[in-house]
């Protein structure tokens, strides 16, 4: 690879690091080209799956301010640059790795810190953003109904107490 090509490649990878919300680093040793194409299709438009030389990726990561990943860049390495929600892409990679034992998840990077394999898998096990928002809305609605009941209870108790006192007074006046 010519020096100008390397400089261009490092610049492109640096931009991908900067533009992505998360990255997942994998080892693809033993995967066929068609299997890699299947993985790329399963990631969809929200992620780019790229194979690059480790030295270029290390340099690009340093240029992008991404730290703590150098030990992951050994052997045949491919990176999923995720733009948008990391859950769906991590889930697709985890599912693909389960079906294709040749793909090994090495780790990742999100929110300014390196992720272990277990953390990447935990992200993959999360439900999608829409499902989590729906659950949150349901919980909030239920809690609002409970809160409304709590706030209404003292007022209704005062009203019942006033009605009981009025009945008691009316009963005392009629008895006298």
From Swiss-Prot:
The keyword Transport does not apply. InterPro entries: Ribosomal_uL10, Ribosomal_uL10-like_sf, Ribosomal_uL10_bac, Ribosomal_uL10_bac_type, Ribosomal_uL10_CS_bac. One of its GO terms (molecular function) is structural constituent of ribosome. GO terms for biological process: translation. SUPFAM superfamilies: Ribosomal protein L10-like. Belongs to the universal ribosomal protein uL10 family. HAMAP family: Ribosomal_uL10. Part of the ribosomal stalk of the 50S ribosomal subunit. The N-terminus interacts with L11 and the large rRNA to form the base of the stalk. The C-terminus forms an elongated spine to which L12 dimers bind in a sequential fashion forming a multimeric L10(L12)X complex. It comes from Mycobacteroides abscessus (strain ATCC 19977 / DSM 44196 / CCUG 20993 / CIP 104536 / JCM 13569 / NCTC 13031 / TMC 1543 / L948). CDD domains: Ribosomal_L10. GO terms for cellular component: large ribosomal subunit. This is Large ribosomal subunit protein uL10. Keywords: Ribonucleoprotein, Ribosomal protein, RNA-binding, rRNA-binding.
